[in-house]
Amino acid sequence: MQFSEHWLRSLVNPPLDSESLGHLLTMAGLEVEEAVPAAAAFSGVVVGRIIEAEKHPNADKLKLCKVDVGQDELLQIVCGAPNAAAGLRVPCAMVGAKLPGFDIKAAKLRGVESFGMLCSARELGLSDDHGGLLELPDNAPIGQDIRNFLALDDTLFTIKLTPNRSDCLSLAGVAREVAALTGQPFALPQIEAVVPAIDDRRPVVLDAPDGCPRYCSRIVRGVDAKAPTPDWMKQRLQRSGVRSISALVDVTNYVMLELGQPLHAFDNAKLVGAIHVRYPHAGEKVLLLNEQTVVPAADTLLIADEARALALAGIMGGEDSGITLDTVDVFLESAFFAPAAIAGRARSYGFVSDASHRFERGVDFELPARAIERATRLILDICGGTAGPADETVAKDHLPERPAVRLRPARARRLLGIDLGDDAIVRLLEGVHLSVEREGDALLVTPPSFRFDIEIEEDLIEEVARLHGYDAIPACAPQGSLMMLDRSESGRSAWDVRHLLAARDFQEVVNYAFVEEAWERDFCANAEPIRLANPIASQMSVMRSSLIPGLAANLVANRKRQQARVRVFEIGRCFERKADGEPVAGFQQPLRVAGLAAGLALPEQWGAASRQVDFYDVKSDVEALFAPRALGFERLSDPALHPGRAASILLDGRRIGLLGEIHPVWVQRYEMGTAPVVFEIELDAALLADLPAYREISRQPAVTRDVALVVEQALTAARVIEVMQEAAPTIVMGMELFDIYHGKGIDPGKKSLAFRVLMQDTQRTLEDAEVDAAVEAIVRHTETSLGARLRG
């Protein structure tokens, strides 16, 4: 909402400069979004009266003017404005004046000396109008500084209101707040009931009292719709961001800005019979003032007469019943429309009006009668005419209630952390017209009709804080005792996991839990994802069941920015439907950790060979995350992963995640460049850690033996090691695969796996006999269990 500081100070005038006033409003919750001068900076411009305006002797389009600026002699000024004429009062820039962008000097124009310049509105920076001189009223004092005459030393405030503070969508509302905050007197213009001179009325029927429980109306006959709007009113409207249209329209807009009550003026001659406030009939249409024809929805409130719909109630009037410059008789409307009946209706038709903006937030339901009296008096003063009685039609049972809200001052003090006495709290609340009664240790506070935001105790506590001043609440650091808590050695935190992955050169990302349906289908084979009822964007319409699609999207975004090496991870929740038969139906949200590596295995540098990251690089990252716990890996078929480069991750025989290279189809479709390698693991599994186990470091020499076994092609090395360990005696410290061989000497469908077996004792040096016996036991057990044979 935009308004003039001068207008505000005509209602309440605190001893504050413009900057301090803006700060006061902001700290009270009425955020000042902008405070700008009403006019550009200029000086040396006064009110001048053109005494003569003759044709320039050397130019057809110029005039030679004699101008009275209150000095002993008339000024000779050459002017090219088409409306320059004798008798006209205009702004006159004297020699030495400083205008926006240039200074005024004495000059010769087509051979004739000119001592100044007559100004248009654009040359003064007041508007874009440059079609002619800015014409001033005949009562403008000659020689007076134009800034003083037009009150240009003004500030235009624009405040950003929260939806609950509709009471401040008017000058009266803002002035009421300033008065309460500064203790200054607040005075609206005196509003007295207009004595009716005629008895003309028009019946009003409230067919929808739930949407409109109060409707005030009045007929004013014999108005002069062509009467000019007073300059003071046009100025206030302009500085509030409202364009002057005609005197009748300007009056309704002015009262809305001043008091906060939207009004509408109908051409009474265009109305038929009684006025009905009702919901639309099937197929009904309304041509609005913005030249838009709408078919009102069933829940849109209408103003209608006996013949047709006239207007969208509380939103916009209709073209067929609107006032024009030929209007003689006016039917004034000032009503209360319930917020629920107006909210969202205008936006559903593709626009928002000043009236709908106010009504959907809440307008004082006691204000319509006062507003119609104020508008009537202004119309009579400006346009003349005779007024009929002000009629009021009310459905009292449907008017909003204002029940008292119980406030406990002790609780307010505890929540706010300030020591405010009960009397101080009462004084603050009564300052904004809240009625307060004492009830023991509590206060019963009744909000006024214009406050729609006071419903519970917390609203009142917030009001106390706001009026006391948020900046007046002392800053106190929170205090609390800290205790050293035991930390289990068998677990670790998500931060530990983050640090481990960061140490492996991964960077953390945080993605939306909403993903594109195609990504969910391609990367998760999820044909029935969990859909959002109201997605924030079409490409974010489903909940993710895996973290991998989000990481893939991060890769694509980085590829488009020429990033050759990408290593990212994320810890977050996924969303899955619970399996049938679970005790509670619905969804589950498991926490997972996932990573993606693409591009170079190592940052490019002269001392290391350049190669692309592969399956085994990321496998080692995952194993490092769980070390010293040993992981198992099994071949995996997954639609998102390469059919020959994917594995399930096992911990203690249980599947906890997956690892693999993205399928070539998706790499090509989503333009990922080189194929990335990804992993995804249950976070709970990554948080488990083995208790530290200490053992003696042997001083004795270790012995190694190499064993080559021929096994079935499909058998994994991990399975062979598992079987070998079953028969290994205590002297065996470890086994590792160091060679795989296919070819000459190996039967088709077979392969040779070579293992290095490490043996050591803590007390003595091992003898060849017991080393050979250990190897023989391992080989024999493997032959029996897996059908392996020792390679000769």
From Swiss-Prot:
Main location: cytoplasm
Cofactor section: Mg(2+)
SUPFAM superfamilies named in the record: Anticodon-binding domain of PheRS, Class II aaRS and biotin synthetases, Nucleic acid-binding proteins, PheT/TilS domain, Putative DNA-binding domain
GO biological process entries: phenylalanyl-tRNA aminoacylation
Limits of the tRNA-binding domain: 39-147
Subcellular localization, as worded in the UniProt entry: Cytoplasm
Enzyme class (EC, first level): ligase
Residue stretches making up the B5 domain: 400-475
SMART domains named in the record: B3_4, B5, FDX-ACB
Cofactor note as given: Binds 2 magnesium ions per tetramer.
Annotated FDX-ACB domain residues: 698-791
One of the Pfam families matching this protein, by short name: B5
Reaction it catalyzes: tRNA(Phe) + L-phenylalanine + ATP = L-phenylalanyl-tRNA(Phe) + AMP + diphosphate + H(+)
GO cellular component: phenylalanine-tRNA ligase complex
Keywords, comma-separated and alphabetical: Aminoacyl-tRNA synthetase, ATP-binding, Cytoplasm, Ligase, Magnesium, Metal-binding, Nucleotide-binding, Protein biosynthesis, RNA-binding, tRNA-binding
Gene3D superfamilies: 3.30.56.10, Bira Bifunctional Protein, Domain 2, Ferrodoxin-fold anticodon-binding domain, Nucleic acid-binding proteins, Phenylalanyl-trna Synthetase, Chain B, domain 3
Family: Belongs to the phenylalanyl-tRNA synthetase beta subunit family. Type 1 subfamily.
Subunit structure: Tetramer of two alpha and two beta subunits.
Official protein name in the record: Phenylalanine--tRNA ligase beta subunit
Organism expressing this protein natively: Aromatoleum aromaticum (strain DSM 19018 / LMG 30748 / EbN1) (Azoarcus sp. (strain EbN1))
